[in-house]
């Protein structure tokens, strides 16, 4: 069977050209950290798929003696900020930590480092951040506040200076974004068998 036409308003998360925000980066923070990008309507791909979770970020050893949970790099972004790192550092999963817990300031700092790096390297028109860890409602606003400080005046663009709430956003589809994006990719592959 090949009938896979999707219904509903899912294009906001999977069709960046429809929003006029191409290039776009999507970062997901859950049991791991993954990321992808669209440039000219095409998924970024090189030697392998992007491994945004394994970028190196400054480890705040003075505030955070946790060595990191990544089996490859220890304290890469994923090793410091994914769900297993939250649980390893604080002794309980993120969904059991209250909004005022110090975990969220540290988490926001690490994720803001990553977002600032992504902005410096790819200069996307929008960054979407989702995943289970971002279900903590105080986290995304903290990340936004820290990104400009991490950039330290280097990127002086109205998207960051004047409308960062529209530049760094949660997925419009919430936790359904990943599965609907996978359906959209499958549908595109079926419509263009050369990509199979």
What is each stretch, according to the model?
Residues 1-10, 14:
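Single conserved hydrophobic/aromatic residue that forms the stacking wall/gate
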Residues 7-8, 48, 120:
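Extracytoplasmic/secreted proteins and extracellular or luminal domains
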Residues 17-25, 59-196:
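ATP-binding/phosphotransfer module of carbohydrate and carboxylate kinases, centering on a glycine-rich
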Residues 33-38:
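Short beta-strand scaffold segments in enzyme catalytic cores
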Residues 48-63:
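A short, polar/charged loop-to-alpha-helix boundary motif
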């Amino acid at each position: 069977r090949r009938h896979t036409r999707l219904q509903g308003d899912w294009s906001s998360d999977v069709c960046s050209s429809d929003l006029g925000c191409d290039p776009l980066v999507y970062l997901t923070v859950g049991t791991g950290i993954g990321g992808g990008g669209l440039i000219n309507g095409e998924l970024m791909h090189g030697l392998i798929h992007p491994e945004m979770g394994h970028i190196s970020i400054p480890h705040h050893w003075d505030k955070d003696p946790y060595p990191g949970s990544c089996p490859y790099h220890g304290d890469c972004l994923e090793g410091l900020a994914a769900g297993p790192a939250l649980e390893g550092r604080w002794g309980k999963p993120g969904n059991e930590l209250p909004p005022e817990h110090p975990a969220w300031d540290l988490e926001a700092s690490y994720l803001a480092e990553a977002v600032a790096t992504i902005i410096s390297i790819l200069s996307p028109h929008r960054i979407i951040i989702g995943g289970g860890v971002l279900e903590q409602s105080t986290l995304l606003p903290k990340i936004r506040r820290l990104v400009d400080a991490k950039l330290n005046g280097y990127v002086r663009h109205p998207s960051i200076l004047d409308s960062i709430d529209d530049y760094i956003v949660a997925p419009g589809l919430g936790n359904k974004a990943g599965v609907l994006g996978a359906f959209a990719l499958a549908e595109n592959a079926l419509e263009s068998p050369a990509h199979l």
